Design a protein with these regions (language model features):
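Subset of outer-membrane beta-barrel
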Residues: 1-217
Length: 217
């Protein structure tokens, strides 16, 4: 979503499926986002996101357009243009963690299944991926800790080649301060490298929010 991107790509704090367990109202929450990606380099790459939450379930649609590309033959002659894209459909669910048959109120567990469709013009691939998340609510009375493993599953081959999933271990924390400030940090550990995002949000009487963040890989 736009907010998580501005705050340094804080996906766990906003989309950890375990957070669905904390949704106690019966309302349907709908969010829309449009984000331009690498806007200082290209002007046609970005994604649209739609999210729906109700009770302990969430539904999402992500469409990523990678921008216009040139299609060439073996001699390098341009034969046309195309726009590769990815579509991701997701369903998430959250619940309390059980320990020895008893519910642990401060810990939630969640799962999200995703159907992924890549369209690379001459080649297409699809697959099924799974995210698993844990949420520890207000550790020591103030720290919200999120843990997750993301993008584990199966993708079909493209032209006989295996497709690597961006599987990762995700660790994040969120510290609310006096109902005005929120501090975010998240680390994403991939095979051979990692990324990190941090952000801060200021809430003015629940009427106006100022968000800032930084992301590096």
């Amino acid at each position: 979503t736009t907010s998580e991107t501005i705050l340094g790509n804080q996906s766990l704090a906003f989309r950890n499926p375990a957070l669905n367990n904390l949704n106690e109202d019966s309302l349907t929450h709908i969010s829309f986002s449009n984000v331009e990606w690498l806007g200082n380099i290209v002007d046609d790459m970005g994604y649209n996101y739609v999210g729906i939450k109700r009770g302990k379930l969430d539904y999402s649609l992500l469409y990523f357009n990678y921008g216009e590309q040139k299609f060439t033959d073996e001699s390098g002659i341009v034969n046309g243009k195309f726009s590769p894209s990815t579509l991701v459909l997701g369903v998430g669910w959250g619940t309390n963690l059980l320990y020895k048959g008893s519910r642990v109120d401060s810990v939630s567990l969640g799962f999200r299944g995703k159907a992924v469709f890549h369209d690379l013009y001459t080649e297409k691939t699809d697959g099924l991926l799974l995210d698993v998340g844990l949420h520890f609510h207000k550790l020591y009375g103030m720290v919200n800790l999120d843990l997750g493993v993301s993008n584990f599953g199966y993708m079909t081959k493209i032209n006989g080649y295996e497709i690597d999933q961006p599987s990762a271990l995700n660790i994040g924390f969120h510290i609310p301060i006096k109902d005005k400030w929120d501090i975010y940090n998240q680390w994403n550990l991939y095979d051979g490298y990692h990324t990190h995002g941090q952000g801060v949000s200021y809430n003015l009487k629940n009427m106006f929010w100022v968000n800032a963040g930084y992301y590096n890989d």
